[in-house]
Design a protein with these regions (language model features):
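Extracellular/periplasmic, surface-exposed regions of secreted and cell-surface proteins
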Residues: 1-193
Length: 193
């Protein structure tokens, strides 16, 4: 016979600071920082700092662009950011046990997952370079972006040999890199007033 009760809760606490700067609607700077703490990680591994920065140059507002009538918008963008992931079960850093009652005695057996005290935040670094363009007073717009995304310390469940007494453990294993180019275009073909 099994004895059991469950009460599972986790907490995420965040501190966020952001600064924006705009000079003459031509030059833009943004800096953001998040300091996140999650109860899903063991003491000493709970907090992660995740900054991001971006800059843009609105070339269409420059004096040398005033005389032309082809481009109604031209903006160059550059961005970098670090994002954290804590998408794991609560208490993955603990080895959890079930209580069993047999012949009047209570015994404890592992639930199957081995706790991992040193798991920490999975992190994703994002780099982006882009350009926004507008033609015919904004009736046609286009954006071109090149990006590079690198994930490291992936939070994954690893199978363990049954001889260990456990079936799995959550660990920071692996890395993924994703890169590409995106293009989008919009048009207002018919405009009524």
């Amino acid at each position: 016979r099994s004895i059991g009760s469950d009460f599972v809760t986790s907490t995420l606490m965040s501190y966020v600071v952001r600064a924006n700067y705009n000079y003459a609607s031509k030059y833009y700077l943004t800096a953001t920082a998040r300091y996140d703490g999650s109860s899903k990680f063991a003491e000493g591994k709970r907090w992660g700092l995740f900054p991001s920065f971006s800059a843009a140059w609105n070339i269409a507002e420059e004096n040398f662009m005033k005389e032309q009538d082809v481009l109604s918008q031209l903006k160059l963008r550059l961005g970098y950011g670090l994002v954290g992931n804590q998408n794991i079960d609560d208490f993955a850093f603990y080895t959890l046990y079930d209580a069993k009652l047999e012949d009047g005695k209570v015994t404890y057996v592992p639930k199957g997952r081995r706790g991992t005290k040193d798991i920490t935040w999975e992190s994703q670094r994002q780099f982006n370079v882009g350009v926004d363009m507008g033609f015919l007073n904004g009736r046609i717009t286009a954006s071109l972006d090149a990006f590079l995304i690198k994930n490291k310390d992936l939070l994954m469940t690893r199978s363990l040999p049954l001889t260990s007494g456990f079936s799995s453990a959550v660990e920071n294993i692996g890395a993924i890199e994703n890169k590409g180019i995106e293009f989008s275009m919009n048009a207002k073909l018919i405009e009524t007033r």
